[in-house]
Structure formats: structure tokens, C-alpha cells
Amino acid sequence: MLGEAVYQKFSSIAQVKATDIDLNEPWLGYADVRDYAQVLNSITEFHPDVIINLAALTDLECCERDQENSWLTNALGAENLGLIANQLDVPYVYISTASIFGGDKEAYTDFDEPNPLSCYAKSKHSGELFVRQCVRKHYVLRAGWMMGGGVKKDKKFVNKIYRQILDGKRELHVVDDKFGAPTYTVDFARGIHRLLESELYGLYNQVCGGSCSRFEVAVEFIRLLGLEGEIEIRKVSSDFFKNEYFAPRPASERLVNMKLNARGLNVMQDWKSCLKEYSVSFIQHSQGASLPAEAAEESRG
């Protein structure tokens, strides 16, 4: 998702070494952020001008089931790359999350105090704290509900909705009690580049403009697909999915890009504009796909 957008943005202007433990693209090499010695060797042989850490275990239920791996990937991995960035004296970009907040406020600025609820959020917050406290040249960017990668790579809410439609579902159940802001990966990658050019290190919220519920995202996506008369979306509470999605989630993950706005560095568009742009790839895919006949299903991200 985000890795592809960042690679496309930076490979057009610089030499990029992109790594992962899942080599699903020809431009990827292998590196495991949990293994300090291995990732140190991988990075130092390349002599980078900047290190961008996109490695994360983001499935909340997976993090609850495998808490050790969550901490090793999201916290220790962040530390390993941060130590290497200090050693090489290069800027370090760490991606944090709106999930680190407890949901007791309607919206959070860069200066609000986190209160993580889930193992995922706690491990990401731990990584964020280390980077902010120990890495000299750091950018910590807090993202919201990621959308990007299209039908092939998007593992988040928008593609979950689309996949249900492809499966022939005509009735979708979507929660209306979770609020936040989508984060379009294309704009997010542009934002990373803008910040690196600025050399204004620090912590930044970086999400799309506006606020919405999961339900509102689903309604807008269905409208953009031209399926308003074909798909029925039913509002449900989070309890509807309590067995499948059992990890604690804050009621509100809405972030405000206060610092980016104050410094004239905000490149993030309104969430509806981003969803419209992002939906083009799904519309193109649907033209070659068999869209639904009848069914009923439940959806949440």
C-alpha cells in the first residue's frame, strides 16, 4: 500500500533501495527490521541519504494474537532503524498512527497526549516515543485510515467493501460509531517528500482533510462506483462485529494537521477528493469484472 506509493514518488527523483520480508514486487529486496545485524548490513552497504521506515504489523487482531511479533516489528524495528539513522547521521522517517489515541476527544492535534488501547497502538506508540526521544534527525508522521494500492494491494476498508461487492453482496453492514480521516497514500508520499525538503524535523499529524465515519466512507465509495441503487448499506454499531474484530478501537481517530498547516507544509487533500481519485482504479477494474447479482454480507475495516 504505502510502500508502493513511496517507491513511485521517490524512485522518479532518486536511487531507492526498497526492502521487505514479503518480496511481492521485482523492485523489492529482503530485509527484516527485527534483525538489527541483518538490516544494518542491508542499509550501510547502500549508503542512504534518508531512511524511511514503513515496516509495520497493522492488523489489530493479528497483533493481539501475536503480541511478541507486534512489539518486535512495530517497536523494536523502529528502534533498530533509528539507531542506524543516528549512526549514519541521516534523517529518519517513522510512520505512526491515529490509533495511539484513546478516542475520548472528537479530534486530536499534534500536541495531544496519546492513550493507546490495543497492542497494535501500544507497540506503535512505543516506537514513536523512541524515535522522538532518541533519534536526532527524525520525522514522525501520524497517519489515519490508509487507502491506497488498489484492488491488488489494498488490505484496508475501501477494498474490503469492494471485495464484498465482487463476491455478489447486495447488502453491506457498516459501523457508524467510528470516526476518523482517510489517509491517501499518494498524498502521504508527497507529504514525506515535502517534509524532507523542509528539514523541519519533528512530529506531524498527516491525514486527509475533513472528518467522517466508516459508514460515510462506504456511502461515498458506493456513490462513486455508481452503485447507489444496487447496493444497500445498513448502519450497525461496533458490537455487530465484536467477535471478528475484537481488538479495542477508539471511537474517534480524527487527527488535525495543525503543525503542517502552521508551517505551510500540508499537501493532503480533502478525503472526498482523495476517495474520488482513488476510486478510478476500482471503476476501471469493475468494468472488466462481474458485479453483484444478489446476496447479503457484513463489512467493516
Describe every region a protein language model picked out.
Residues 3-4:
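N-terminal Rossmann-fold NAD(P) dinucleotide-binding loop
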Residues 21-37:
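Rossmann-fold cofactor-recognition segment
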Residues 33-73, 86:
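NAD(P)H-binding glycine-rich loop region in Rossmannoid oxidoreductase-like domains
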Residues 72, 76-80, 100-141, 145-147, ...:
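Catalytic helix-loop patch of NAD(P)-dependent Rossmann-fold dehydrogenases
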Residues 129-180, 186-187, 193:
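NAD(P)-dependent short-chain dehydrogenase/reductase
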Residues 150-152, 178-187, 206-224, 277:
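Substrate-binding strand-loop-helix patch
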Residues 191, 198-245, 286-294:
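Mid/C-terminal beta-alpha module of Rossmann-like enzyme folds, strongest
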Residues 261, 270-301:
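Amphipathic terminal alpha-helices
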